[in-house]
Amino acid sequence: MSLAEQIEQQQGDAGWSAHLQLRFVQRGDVTRLGAWKHFGPLLVQRPFYPEGSPCHVYVLHPPGGIVAGDRLELNIHLEPGSHALLTMPGASKFYRSIGPTARLTQRFHLAAGSTLEWLPQDSIFFSGARASLASRFSLEPGARLLAWETLCLGRPVMHERFDHGTLDSLLHIELPDEVGLHERLRIAGGHLDKLGGHPLLATFCAAPADQAVLEQVRSLLDELGNPAGATLLGSLLVIRLLDHDNQHLQRTLQRLWHVLRPAILGLPACPPRIWAT
C-alpha cells in the first residue's frame, strides 16, 4: 500500500498530539537552553554555538509529515537578554486528508531585551490537505525579532497543483505600545486567486526597524523579478514575497536575512550550517 493510501485510510482516526516547550536563558555571556519538555515527535537537536553567545537550535518536525487530526504545539520562551536562532533541517509537510483538520500552533514570547531569529523551512501543503497554521509572537520592550514563514501550496517542483483542500493561516505579532500585526489567510477549494496564482508565499518580519532599513530592503526587492513588497508598521517591518520556485524564494529570504541581521541586530550574518547542505 502506498503512503498516500495509508494516509487516506486515517480519515476515521482522531490523529495524534505533539508539543515542544523551550526556554532560553542568558548565563554570563552565553544563551543556554535552560529547560525543555516534549511529547511526541517534536524534538530539538543539541544546541550549536558557531558565533559565541547566540544559541543555534534545530527543531525537528515529524519525519512522516502531518496528517488528519494531528495537533502540534510549539512554545518558545526567551528570558531577558537571551538570543536564540531556530531553524529546521526539513520542511513541514501537511498531507492530503478527508479527515479532521491538522493543526500546528506556534507561540513565541520574547522577554525584555531578548532576541529571536525564527528561520524555518517551508510548510508544504499537499493538494487535498486540510490544515490550520497559527503563529503568535509577543515582544516585550527592547526585544528584537527576525522571523519568516513560507507557505507552499502544492508541490511546484513536481508540477503538482493545490487544486483542492483548505488552509487557514494566522500570523499575529504583538509589540509593546504598538498595533503590531494580525493577518489571516484562508485558501479553500484550491483557489489561489488571493496569491495571484502563485503557489509560494513568504512573509518576513523584523523589529525594531526604521525608514532607513525599509529603504535598504526595498532596494533589494527592486532587483527581483517576482512580486514583492515591504511595509513599515510602526517599528515592525513586514516583507511579503510571491514565487513559483521554492529554491529561488529561499535564496531571497536568506539574502534579506543577510541584510537585516546587521541592520536590526548589529551582528554579521552567521548562516546555520544546515543551509549549506
From Swiss-Prot:
It is found in: Cytoplasm. One of its GO terms (cellular component) is cytoplasm. GO terms for molecular function: nickel cation binding. Keywords: Chaperone, Cytoplasm, Nickel insertion. It holds the Pfam family UreD. It comes from the Bacteria. Signal peptide: none annotated. HAMAP family: UreD (MF_01384). Required for maturation of urease via the functional incorporation of the urease nickel metallocenter. UreD, UreF and UreG form a complex that acts as a GTP-hydrolysis-dependent molecular chaperone, activating the urease apoprotein by helping to assemble the nickel containing metallocenter of UreC. The UreE protein probably delivers the nickel. Belongs to the UreD family. This is Urease accessory protein UreD. It comes from Pseudomonas putida (strain GB-1).
